Amino acid sequence: MPSTTLSTVLSDINEFVVKQGHGVKGLSELGLQTLPNQYVHPPEERLSSMDVVSDDSIPVIDVSNWEDPKVAKLICDAAEKRGFFQIVNHGIPLEMLEKAKAATYRFFREPAEEKKKYSKENCPTSHVRYSTSFLPQIEKALEWKDHLSMFYVSDEEAAQYWPPSCRDDALEYLKSCEMVSRKLLEALMQGLNVNEIDDAKESLLMGSRRININYYPKCPNPDLTVGVGRHSDISTLTLLLQDDIGGLYVRKLEHEAWSHVPPVKGALVINIGDALQIMSNGRYKSIEHRVLANETNDRISVPVFVNPKPNDIVGPLPEVLASGEKPVYKPVLYSDYAKHFYRKAHNGKDTIAFARIE
């Protein structure tokens, strides 16, 4: 692209990246030598190598025998002590994982004109959203990331509204995660003295699901920006499929230090969300995490968010409080909690205060 055109693009980043649908991927492909100012984050929001603990590791749990009490204990221990862990031998074939990643590339390689059909301004449903950064309309500094979010309502709605380039493989993968989510939650509920997941509990724990496909293009100055800023998820659980590039960092519990989550072939990264931290009255931990940009490789990831239904009331479970434990959180309408999260830029774990009893 001629330098004059590049200058024009840089003079109105929002027009090119957001309105025209090129995303940050399109910006990266212009051959940038330096990072545009709109993506430069303040030093306190960048991750220094001094803050990274290299000898720390996230647990990797073999769940080939879901019924083994030792497996359930490992899952509960990881949820209490780390909030993040990886699982292997989970039952989803490697071929299906690869198809989900391939579907991600197919969508993001579509022309901008095709991708922008799914933007907030153009898509006929709010359940599908192509966007860049997190909340570009209010963020002081943008994140170096594009994403497509698909909220699952029904197969019929997915057939009508999800992008054809990724729809079938994304839907198949989302459904395959349902069994894994259920097995994880059965184990986690045992640790909270919940012996059975009845219909009401099922709605509360996993009543709604959303799949995102994320694209992090290579960046000219990765040390000046972020792929995703510090935040915790508001889900019950998040199941993340990552590629082999790396870049996900997790905050150590009660520390300022951060640990890298190394890619493990065939693994899923599991993290506890705010909803489950609230339901467990703080026993299970929803931990801050972030994604770094990198200079040499494009990176993709596919998170599946398992959530309560929007009209569910989320609070400490009765079984958790049955022994007389004092509630740390008040009951909140899940849709209100989600609205609180989406009204501001990523800012650590601030959202949990919305439900905390002062």
From Swiss-Prot:
An MF annotation (GO) of this entry: 2-oxoglutarate-dependent dioxygenase activity
UniProt tissue specificity: Mostly expressed in underground stems and stems, and, at low levels, in tubers, leaves and petioles.
PROSITE patterns found in the cross-reference section: FE2OG_OXY
The keyword Metal-binding belongs to this UniProt entry's keyword annotation: yes
UniProt entry keywords in alphabetical sequence: Dioxygenase, Iron, Metal-binding, Oxidoreductase
Binding residue positions for 2-oxoglutarate: 216, 299, 301
Group of enzyme by EC: oxidoreductase
GO BP annotations listed: coumarin biosynthetic process; phenylpropanoid biosynthetic process; response to fungus; response to molecule of fungal origin
rRNA-binding is among the record's keywords: no
Pathway annotation from the record: Phenylpropanoid metabolism
Top-level lineage group: Eukaryota
Induction text: Transiently induced by fungal (F.oxysporum f.sp. batatas O-17) and chitosan treatments, in association with the accumulation of umbelliferone and its glucoside (skimmin) in the tubers.
EC number, UniProt record: 1.14.11.61, 1.14.11.62
Effect of pH on activity: Optimum pH is 7.2.
Cofactor dependence: L-ascorbate; Fe(2+)
InterPro entries: DIOX_N (IPR026992), IPNS-like_FE2OG_OXY (IPR044861), IPNS-like_sf (IPR027443), Oxoglu/Fe-dep_dioxygenase_dom (IPR005123)
Catalysed transformations (reactions): (E)-4-coumaroyl-CoA + 2-oxoglutarate + O2 = (E)-2,4-dihydroxycinnamoyl-CoA + succinate + CO2; (E)-feruloyl-CoA + 2-oxoglutarate + O2 = (E)-6-hydroxyferuloyl-CoA + succinate + CO2
Residues that bind Fe cation: 231, 233, 289
Cofactor: how bound: Binds 1 Fe(2+) ion per subunit.
Residue span(s) of domain Fe2OG dioxygenase: 207-308
Family: Belongs to the iron/ascorbate-dependent oxidoreductase family.
Function: 2-oxoglutarate (OG)- and Fe(II)-dependent dioxygenase (2OGD) involved in scopoletin and umbelliferone biosynthesis. Converts feruloyl CoA into 6'-hydroxyferuloyl CoA, and p-coumaroyl CoA into 2,4-dihydroxycinnamoyl-CoA, but has no activity with caffeoyl-CoA.
Annotated protein name in UniProt: Bi-functional coumaroyl CoA and feruloyl CoA ortho-hydroxylase F6H2-1-1
Protein encoded by which gene: F6H2-1-1
